[in-house]
Amino acid sequence: MPLNFETDEQKKCYELLRADVENIVKETGYDELYGHKLTPDDQFYEEVIVDNLIYKFCRANQFEIEGAKSQLKKTLKWRKEFKPLHAAFSETHDSLLNDVCAITVSEENDPNQKVVSWNLYGLLVKHKEVFEDTDKFLRFRIGLMERGLQLLDFASEDNYLMTQVHDYNNVSMWRLDPAIKKCSKAIIEVFQDFYPETLFSKFFVNVPYVMTWLYEIVKRFVSEDTRKKFIVMSDGTQMKDYLKVLPKEYGGEATLNSSKLENIEPNAYVSYLLTQCGGEEPAETTAPEQEKETATA
């Protein structure tokens, strides 16, 4: 991810926040962000990754230092409490949810459209029971997001953002179940608050023209910069104008079910946290000496 600064003030904001990372980790008692270690005390630390992650928080806050610092702190505190890595790799979710949400990867797609998260809400509305427990649905949806983030390379120039597709085929244009609205609102707020600058574009597909409630709900909870990434279309096959590789349901060749990744493996640091620390990552945690020796051999 390129670090671009249009002014000296923007660069200063970044430098101030970058220099304060270790203090923020100590204050929050949590040393993990999107599956990566923030402090340089063992082999899991990758400086260029942390550089780029911190830049995201600056950019998301228009390079205003207090806003960027506050959001980073809140994000780490939330991750410590919510345990999104557990939701992604340790918890078992409703099989129905796994059938209507998917992640695909294609190196043939344009930069930052290689990793795509698919959410088929038109199928979900037939099973309203999955939305009755907001927390349960949220943990599934956040887990899906975290697995997608594992497929990104924050140090690259062409794969440091995700693309999302929300398919509303067969969703009623006149009314939406209150439980679905509640879940949608909760997910939008979490992504806005704790996943800044992780999205390249979001497609709303198979949306009837008169279905204005969709955009009205979403725009209330996201920033102007985020809204600019939204693409709304009435026909899913219109996506061929944006993505080179598509599932058959959207004008491509292979079906979404056959294209989706079934097993996404966590990186070494995430595996360490889940197995050695039980998902908890205090500020002073370091890897075992044996692992350090292996890594430096």
UniProtKB/Swiss-Prot annotation:
Reaction catalyzed: a 1,2-diacyl-sn-glycero-3-phospho-(1D-myo-inositol)(in) = a 1,2-diacyl-sn-glycero-3-phospho-(1D-myo-inositol)(out)
Signal peptide coordinates: none
Topology class, membrane: Peripheral membrane protein
One Pfam family per UniProt: CRAL_TRIO
GO MF, one annotated term: metal ion binding
BP GO terms, sorted: Golgi to plasma membrane protein transport; regulation of exocytosis
Cofactor: heme b
Binding annotation for heme: Y121, R141, H166, Y168, K202
Gene Ontology CC terms: cortical endoplasmic reticulum; cytosol; endoplasmic reticulum membrane; plasma membrane
Gene3D superfamilies membership: CRAL-TRIO lipid binding domain
Record-linked InterPro entries: CRAL-TRIO_dom, CRAL-TRIO_dom_sf, CRAL/TRIO_N_dom, CRAL/TRIO_N_dom_sf, Sfh5
Job of this protein: Non-classical phosphatidylinositol (PtdIns) transfer protein (PITP), which exhibits PtdIns-binding/transfer activity in the absence of detectable PtdCho-binding/transfer activity. Regulates PtdIns(4,5)P2 homeostasis at the plasma membrane. Heme-binding protein that may play a role in organic oxidant-induced stress responses.
Family classification: Belongs to the SFH5 family.
Protein name: Phosphatidylinositol transfer protein SFH5
Lineage of the organism: Eukaryota, Fungi, Dikarya, Ascomycota, Saccharomycotina
